Regions:
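A polyanion-binding, active-site-adjacent surface
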Residues: 3-229
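Short, low-complexity, charge-dense intrinsically disordered segments
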Residues: 233-240, 244-248
């Protein structure tokens, strides 16, 4: 088996101990477990990215769920957020099946790669700004090792802000004043850079209250595919939004 640089980076991430609070939380959750998962051997470590390393669409999420990814060891796997996300990815042609239950379930992602702003499950699903910054170097290296990305889909405002912080640090963008988070909004950040699509996160809170429906999320990924295949100039709503931002 040939290991790509992105694979070697994931192995490095597995050994990370930069955030003592997160590591303690992950191992404690893995030891105590939830009653429904007492027969599981929890992953309890940093969760690696997952998907097609040559994909044109990159999903950036928030962080692993305590009894989801922290249990299964795969992004968005084993909780309600993943149930919604993979159902949508299957319907829109990015996933081989609509369910994601374990690392051994046979799921294959096509033309899409999934990563997160933080790699360890945080208490209350809220990593601190420092913990997100601790993970950022891994995220930046992933961006450099994914050669075909045309569209970045940020699930939630934290992921959106984290990606923009990377672009600002790298000098790709200046002011962020015109880049305002919202659902299914598309942005051209700079020439030669991937398009950015912001989306509500498929959290249980958002989906159970109807703030985000599967149809709304599917619209995001249909747009992501369209932009990846045809470019932003073929997306009329993107053109309209960019004209308001002063883009071409």
């Amino acid at each position: 088996m040939t290991f790509l640089p992105i694979d070697r980076l994931q192995q490095e991430i597995l050994q990370c101990n930069r955030c003592p609070r997160l590591r303690e939380h992950c191992t404690q959750v893995a030891a105590v477990k939830r009653r429904a998962y007492l027969d599981w051997e929890y992953w309890g470590r940093p969760v690696p990215a997952f998907g097609d390393p040559y994909g044109r669409v990159l999903i950036v999420g928030l962080a692993p769920g305590a009894h989801g990814s922290n249990r299964t060891g795969r992004m968005f796997t084993g909780d309600r957020s993943g149930d919604v996300l993979y159902s949508v990815l299957h319907k829109t042609g990015f996933a081989s099946q609509p369910h994601s239950t374990s690392r051994e379930d046979g799921l294959i992602l096509r033309d899409l790669f999934i990563t997160a702003s933080a790699r360890c499950a945080p208490p209350g699903n809220k990593p601190t700004p420092e913990e997100v910054r601790n993970c950022r170097s891994y995220f930046e290296r992933e961006l450099d090792l994914l050669p075909n990305v045309k569209v970045v889909v940020a699930l939630g405002k934290l992921a959106f802000d984290n990606y923009l912080d990377v672009l600002k640090t790298r000098g790709v963008i200046g002011s962020r004043a015109a880049l305002v988070f919202g659902h299914n909004k598309v942005f051209r950040t700079a020439a030669g850079q991937p398009a950015l699509i912001s989306s509500y996160h498929p959290s249980q809170q958002n989906t159970s209250t109807g703030k985000l429906t599967e149809a709304m999320l599917a619209a995001v990924f249909r747009r992501a595919r369209k932009v990846a295949e045809r470019g932003m100039h073929r997306d009329t709503e993107t053109q309209r939004k960019n004209s308001k931002l002063g883009g071409s």
